[in-house]
């Protein structure tokens, strides 16, 4: 067998051993994010592209420090907390984060998230390229439920 044939045979063997090529794993699903105020009958629906990050931005009610929670929708119709950002070590510890740094990756899936609209500065939702106040759905103290509806 010539050196060129051996090289080709070795390359063919390596390709066969590697198996079929796989696509990158999905980093999120497309779908619709729904935020509802069940008591008032108001809701907000936001269409999201696959893997599109949406965020809830607020002042932590205990520590009065800024927090950003980043989420995506998964293929199972759940909301997945992907990251928490805060300059406050106390806020990060509240989330169970003990390492240094303001931003921390997470992987916490939830079927729904319940919020109370803050009595001070209301939370804001950044989704679909728009930022909206939770006050668009109710008053301070109202209960909001966030869910995913896969497409």
Question: How does the language model describe each region?
Answer:
Residues 24-86:
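N-terminal secretory signal peptides
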Residues 1, 13, 76:
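Residue-level marker of positions within ordered structural domains that often coincide
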Residues 9-17:
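Bacterial N-terminal signal peptides
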Residues 1-8:
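Bacterial N-terminal signal peptides that target proteins for export
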Residues 54, 74-151:
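Mature, soluble, non-transmembrane domains
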Residues 18-24:
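N-terminal membrane-targeting segments
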């Amino acid at each position: 067998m010539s050196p060129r044939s051996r090289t080709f045979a070795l390359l063919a063997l390596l390709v066969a051993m590697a198996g079929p090529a796989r696509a990158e794993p999905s980093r999120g699903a497309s779908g619709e994010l729904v935020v509802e105020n069940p008591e008032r009958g108001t809701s907000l629906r936001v269409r999201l592209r696959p893997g599109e990050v949406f965020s809830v931005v607020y002042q932590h009610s205990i520590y009065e420090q800024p927090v950003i929670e980043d989420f995506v929708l998964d293929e199972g119709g759940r909301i997945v907390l992907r990251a928490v950002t805060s300059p406050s070590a106390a806020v990060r510890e509240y989330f169970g984060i003990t390492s240094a740094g303001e931003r921390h990756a997470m992987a916490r899936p939830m079927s729904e998230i319940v919020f109370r609209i803050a009595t001070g500065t209301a939370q804001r939702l950044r989704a679909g390229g728009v930022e909206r106040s939770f006050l668009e759905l109710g008053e301070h103290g109202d209960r909001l439920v966030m869910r995913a509806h896969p497409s």
